[in-house]
């Protein structure tokens, strides 16, 4: 199942199945109270149109590459994991000080259950210059 961001703020959920399961489902096999609501489905369509028209998938690929390249030579950064705009930056020590200092620079990041991993979860429309700013702040913090 998935839900987040499908409707750009309008509550929507989805259930994805593989081809094997899909071939066994027939029309009207499943019933829902709110399934297929017109407003929700219009929001989903508009979201997918915006993703396609604004080239957000290609942008996410560019953001991932820029993030990896920008952080490759920053001391203290052990590695970058993830795909597209959903990345985990692994440090050689706890990342909590970075998380707090980035927040002071108005850069919001996420923490992880792994204390050395900082989560970067920008929107798909993030610009590469914003990633450069993130990397430069990390570098400044590392050199401070």
Positions of PLM-derived features:
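Conserved N-terminal phosphate-binding loop of PLP-dependent enzymes in the Aspartate aminotransferase
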Residues: 1-144
């Amino acid at each position: 199942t998935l839900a987040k961001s499908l409707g750009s703020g309008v509550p929507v959920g989805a259930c994805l199945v593989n081809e094997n399961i899909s071939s066994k489902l027939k029309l009207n096999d499943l019933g829902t109270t709110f399934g297929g609501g017109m407003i929700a489905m219009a929001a989903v369509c508009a979201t997918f149109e915006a993703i396609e028209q604004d080239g957000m998938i290609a942008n996410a690929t560019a953001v991932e590459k820029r993030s990896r390249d920008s952080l490759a030579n920053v001391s203290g950064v052990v590695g970058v994991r993830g795909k597209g705009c959903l990345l985990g930056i692994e440090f050689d020590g706890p990342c909590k000080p970075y998380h707090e200092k980035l927040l002071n620079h108005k850069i919001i990041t996420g923490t992880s259950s792994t204390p050395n991993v900082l989560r970067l979860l920008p929107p798909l429309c993030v610009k590469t210059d914003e990633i450069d700013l993130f990397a430069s702040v990390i570098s400044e913090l590392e050199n401070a």
